[in-house]
């Protein structure tokens, strides 16, 4: 039978043996910059062919990992997979619905990485372990719509019993945070 590890490209089991789940092969060019070539064995899917033969509602693991968070929520909602939705919904809540499920963390901006970390705390829900969060200008580079989601997420952390300190220079955000702290 197949185990969880067969559907992860991070460990041996189901990942492509040739590229070790990277989907690409790095070719050293000695005096020039290295180049990445799509793995010929898995064709960039990162998985062994027998794993790709396994489907959930017509999609294999590679196709699912290429879905954005928003697409995955809709896909799993249609299949009544509430447990999965509960785990990925906080990513949407912090404004990261556009990220692919299998996207490498090395491709994330600093702000995106911060929001992934924030989402990981939101998914935990109420715990006895309380955390002090210090955010240094978390709105940098964010669209106004995403700033609103960020502020909602920070408020959610407070409602879960955590403490939040925000260092910010944008007057609109300072005003909104002040209003939230006065509640």
Regions found by a protein language model. Name each.
Residues 1-183:
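Conserved phosphate-binding elements of NTP-dependent enzyme cores
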């Amino acid at each position: 039978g197949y185990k969880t590890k067969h559907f992860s490209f991070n460990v041996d089991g189901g990942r492509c043996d040739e590229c070790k789940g990277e989907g690409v092969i790095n070719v050293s060019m000695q005096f020039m910059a290295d180049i990445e070539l799509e793995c010929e064995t898995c064709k960039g899917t990162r998985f062994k062919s027998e794993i790709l033969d396994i489907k959930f509602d017509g999609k294999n693991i590679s196709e699912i990992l290429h879905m954005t968070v928003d697409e995955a929520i809709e896909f799993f909602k249609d299949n009544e997979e509430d447990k999965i939705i509960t785990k990925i919904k906080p990513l949407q809540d912090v404004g990261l619905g556009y990220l692919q499920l299998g996207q490498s963390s090395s491709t994330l901006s600093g702000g995106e990485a911060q929001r992934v970390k924030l989402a990981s705390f939101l998914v935990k829900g109420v715990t006895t372990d309380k955390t002090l969060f210090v955010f240094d200008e978390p709105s940098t580079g964010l669209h106004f719509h995403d700033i609103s989601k960020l502020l909602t997420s920070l408020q959610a952390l407070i409602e879960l019993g955590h403490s939040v300190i925000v260092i910010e220079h944008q007057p609109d955000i300072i005003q909104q945070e002040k209003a939230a702290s006065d509640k």
